Amino acid sequence: MDITVLFKLTYGLYVVGTFDGERPVGCIINTCFQVTSQNPILAVSLNKNNFTLEAIRKNKRFSLSIIAEESDPAVIGSFGYRSSRDCDKYEGFGYDVVEGAPVVKGQFAGRLILDAMNFVENETHYVVMARLVETVKGEGTPMTYDYFHRVVKGKAPKNAPTYVAEEEKPRQEAAHASDGKKHRYQCIVCNHIVEMEGNLPDDYRCPLCKATKDKFERVME
């Protein structure tokens, strides 16, 4: 079965935020859709290993910020490729509290505040059925997952429902390219790919996840 056909399904990108006690936590998801028209209920997919899911199961109330093409891409790196168990994902961005849920500051296409109603267990993910509590208008064009792949040049984190392990391509250390030609380098943290002449600068950081130069490998064509 060719599961790459699934790549033709359309998705967005969203920041989910909630409180773990008094501490704001959050993550990036790509699967959210409205399932009722009146008294709206939404379905949100979260990985079983996701710390944010644990917090939502306890707290019930959470926010969903709709990422726009104009949003700071660093938000995707901070919230998408690290765990709230180990770090403060809101550091460098800040947050506001809307109806009891944290929302990361910045430009987004809109915000939703939701209350989790029930949790439907599947093999790798829970589908959270949640009642809409409040909305906040935003600005910008909602970012699709296709735009994320083509323009931002990012790839799905391993906790995403759309994640598929790709065949490894031969690579070599980023520091080995000094011939002045254009080369492609891939971040081993978030899989972001950058094209640049010669070597990456010593102080280079990934625009998505802020990883340092030593976390990049040259992609052999």
Residue map of PLM features:
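Residues immediately within or flanking Cys/His clusters that coordinate Zn2+
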Residues: K182-R184, D203
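Short, intrinsically disordered terminal segments enriched in charged and Pro/Gly residues
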Residues: H176-S178, R218-E221
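Basic, polyanion-binding surface patches
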Residues: M1-K182, V189
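Short, non-ligating residues that shape and space the ligands of small metal-coordination modules
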Residues: M196-E197, K213-R218
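Short Cys/His-rich zinc-binding micro-motifs
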Residues: C190-M196
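Short linker/helix segments within small regulatory modules
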Residues: M196-R205
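Short cysteine-rich clusters marking metal-coordination/redox-active sites
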Residues: C187-C190, C206-C209
